[in-house]
């Protein structure tokens, strides 16, 4: 499926100079959303995944249906102060600023094989931080899946040595 048909291009959002790739039209089309989920599930099935991890918020949108289809758990990565129990944290840079990400300390057991999912690979800061959290807990990053990659931002260089699936590139 040509997923680009289901991704809206929004100039100057969230600020001037940014060309936002909006995945909500893809999610609004059940067949397209299912096809994207199925493509990631097919990729994950070859990697013996124990748990899916996704950063908020759009990583949840991708990761939850994938974890459901794989019959494995989903571990959310959230901004500081959003998870109720003991967490580990990491500071990170993103396309337009800096922030802190957290994951529950018991979300991943040492040796578990993890699939990280997110909607978009831009500069790579969010995923690099998510990888650090997973690996600090002893998880093995078995794969990383994105709907969209913005190749001109070179985020892929942050993922050298990791197996990456991207459904559409810009």
Swiss-Prot record:
One of its GO terms (biological process) is AMP salvage. Pathway: Purine metabolism; AMP biosynthesis via salvage pathway; AMP from adenine: step 1/1. CDD domains: PRTases_typeI. InterPro entries: Ade_phspho_trans, PRibTrfase_dom, PRTase-like, UPRTase/APRTase. The keyword Cytoplasm applies. GO terms for molecular function: adenine binding; adenine phosphoribosyltransferase activity; AMP binding. One of its GO terms (cellular component) is cytoplasm. It comes from the Bacteria. It is found in: Cytoplasm. Its EC number is 2.4.2.7. The keyword Cytoplasm applies. It catalyses: AMP + diphosphate = 5-phospho-alpha-D-ribose 1-diphosphate + adenine. Keywords: Cytoplasm, Glycosyltransferase, Purine salvage, Transferase. Catalyzes a salvage reaction resulting in the formation of AMP, that is energically less costly than de novo synthesis. Homodimer. Belongs to the purine/pyrimidine phosphoribosyltransferase family. This is Adenine phosphoribosyltransferase.
């Amino acid at each position: 499926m040509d997923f680009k048909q289901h991704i809206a291009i929004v100039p100057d959002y969230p600020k001037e100079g940014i060309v936002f790739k909006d995945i909500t039209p893809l999610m609004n089309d059940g067949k397209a959303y299912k096809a994207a989920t199925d493509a990631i599930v097919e990729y994950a099935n070859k990697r013996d995944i124990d748990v899916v991890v996704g950063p908020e918020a759009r990583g949840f949108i991708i990761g939850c249906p994938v974890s459901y289809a794989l019959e494995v758990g989903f571990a959310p990565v959230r901004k500081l102060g959003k998870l109720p129990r003991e967490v580990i944290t990491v500071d990170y840079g993103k396309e337009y600023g800096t922030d802190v990400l957290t994951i529950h300390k018991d979300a991943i057991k040492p040796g578990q094989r993890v699939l990280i999912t997110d909607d978009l690979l831009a500069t790579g800061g969010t995923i690099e931080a998510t990888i650090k959290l997973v690996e600090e807990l002893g998880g093995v990053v078995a794969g990383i899946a994105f709907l969209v990659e913005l190749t001109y931002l070179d985020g892929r260089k942050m993922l050298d040595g990791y197996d990456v699936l991207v459904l559409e590139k810009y």
